[in-house]
């Protein structure tokens, strides 16, 4: 039986994820007029562009909500954000610059916590503002049904009647004004923005054109570092981790993760740290483009990865990175709480993060330009005396290395025999002027 309702569920309670913006305001009032009983739920995710959270539920009641609740999701979001950092759950990168999956993390928290609040009010129909072309419609669908298996989904933007009557922002603004609310449509930006405490996403409209760059974006979590007139002074900052969790910035410990992340945002934001321009694959495989901000997570990740590489061996780091990319994709797809994601996350938290204790000192400059000045940890396996070129008591002797190299003869002989087999079968051809074989199609590429 379908869990998606295509018409207004008149006479029934409908929970709506309410942001206070024009879209959800018009949808809530429209549903009320069509006979539904709307309940409004607003997630406080520490959005940097939200000036007054308490005003949002009051708006919802004014527009016809039977009840309106503000759900503080910040502590949970902070915990999930640090879990993602510990596991390196970030798969979208361009030339080493990372997107920190801040929107998928926000959806995981919003989708579960709002639906849990709805269950408390005996509300089992949920609507939100996600469109059918995006990722969020699937993320919210999964998280909603994981939290409440009896949930039904009603999205006004999938209801043809709503689209016919209020198909655009101008129509919504006129509808609210006619209803006596005097709702003024805000000026259209050249892109849309979605944010939470961990980061901000700017996309759509002019940013869909690849000839429009980061320069058209007005950052909300930091400075426009690319502008010559914006002064950015170099700054030295220290980040301390204990068993994989960040605990102090510049020697100042913070009582909770929320406060620490907010302070990390302020520090990184002064430099425009963590901004990136990414082309990515949406869940439906179509490509989209976004400009991202995440100054705090970027700062913490620099320190965390420095400690990871100084503490763990190569094979552990390889597994951490491979699993992190897989976990990042699962997070992006709305599968953060699926068993396969929990397995990868728990492994990284237990066997990688728990050993990460120490402090990293970083010099921040402009944008993503930085230098690591010092790394201190009781768990470092980096020991310079082992490889020192000075005359010191080494961990091994020249004779030890001769023996190690001699043992390599076994696999070198095996490799030569395999190359000879490939040459006889025509896969390789003898190199010109060298004993090293060449691929048989090397000449064809010239």
Swiss-Prot record:
It catalyses: L-citrulline + L-aspartate + ATP = 2-(N(omega)-L-arginino)succinate + AMP + diphosphate + H(+). InterPro entries: Arg_succ_synth_type2_subfam, Arginosuc_syn_C, Arginosuc_syn_N, Arginosuc_synth, Arginosuc_synth_CS, Arginosuc_synth_type_1_subfam, AS_cat/multimer_dom_body, AS_multimer_C_tail. Coiled coil: none annotated. L-citrulline binds at residues 99, 135, 139, 192, 201, 203, 280. L-aspartate binds at residues 131, 135-136. It is found in: Cytoplasm. The keyword ATP-binding applies. GO terms for biological process: argininosuccinate metabolic process; L-arginine biosynthetic process; urea cycle. HAMAP family: Arg_succ_synth_type2. Belongs to the argininosuccinate synthase family. Type 2 subfamily. This is Argininosuccinate synthase. It comes from Variovorax paradoxus (strain S110).
């Amino acid at each position: 039986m379908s869990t998606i309702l295509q018409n207004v569920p008149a006479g029934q309670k409908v929970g709506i994820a309410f942001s206070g913006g024009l879209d959800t305001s018009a949808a809530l009032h429209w549903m009320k007029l069509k006979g539904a009983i709307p309940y409004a739920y607003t997630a406080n995710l520490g959005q940097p562009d939200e000036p007054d959270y308490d005003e949002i539920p009051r708006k919802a009641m004014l527009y016809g909500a039977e009840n309106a609740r503000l759900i503080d999701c910040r502590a949970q979001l902070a915990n999930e954000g640090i879990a993602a950092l510990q596991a390196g759950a970030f798969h979208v990168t361009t030339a080493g610059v990372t997107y920190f999956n801040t929107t998928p993390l926000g959806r995981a928290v919003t989708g579960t916590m709002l639906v849990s609040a709805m269950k408390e009010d005996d509300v089992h129909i949920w609507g939100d503002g996600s469109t059918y072309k995006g990722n969020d419609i699937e993320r919210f669908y999964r998280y909603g049904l994981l939290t409440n298996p009896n949930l039904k989904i009603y999205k006004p933007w999938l209801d043809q009647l709503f689209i016919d009557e209020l198909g655009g922002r101008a129509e919504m603004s006129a509808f609210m004004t006619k209803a006596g609310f005097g709702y003024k449509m805000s000026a259209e930006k050249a892109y849309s923005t979605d944010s939470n405490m961990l980061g901000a996403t700017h996309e759509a409209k002019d940013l869909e054109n690849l000839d429009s760059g980061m320069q058209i974006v007005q950052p909300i979590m930091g400075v426009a570092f690319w502008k010559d007139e914006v002064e950015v002074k170099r700054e030295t900052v220290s980040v301390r981790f204990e068993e994989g969790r960040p605990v102090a910035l510049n020697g100042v410990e913070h009582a909770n993760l929320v406060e620490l992340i907010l302070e990390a945002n302020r520090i990184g934001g002064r430099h425009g740290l963590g901004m990136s321009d990414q082309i990515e694959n949406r869940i439906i495989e179509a490509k989209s483009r976004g400009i991202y901000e995440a100054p705090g997570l970027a700062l913490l990740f620099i320190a965390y990865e420095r400690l990871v590489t100084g503490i763990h061996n190569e094979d552990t780091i390889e597994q951490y990175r491979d699993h992190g990319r897989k976990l990042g994709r699962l997070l992006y797809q709305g599968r953060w709480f699926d068993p396969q994601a929990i397995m990868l996350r728990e492994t990284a938290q237990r066997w990688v993060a728990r050993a990460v204790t120490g402090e990293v000192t970083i010099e921040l400059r402009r944008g993503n330009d930085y230098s690591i000045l010092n790394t201190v940890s009781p768990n470092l396996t980096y020991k310079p005396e082992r490889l020192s070129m000075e005359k010191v008591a080494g961990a091994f002797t020249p004779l030890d290395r001769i023996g190690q190299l001699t043992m390599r003869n076994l696999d070198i002989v095996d490799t030569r025999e395999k190359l000879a087999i490939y040459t006889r079968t025509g896969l390789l051809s003898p190199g010109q002027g060298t004993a090293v074989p060449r691929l048989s199609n090397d000449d064809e590429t010239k």
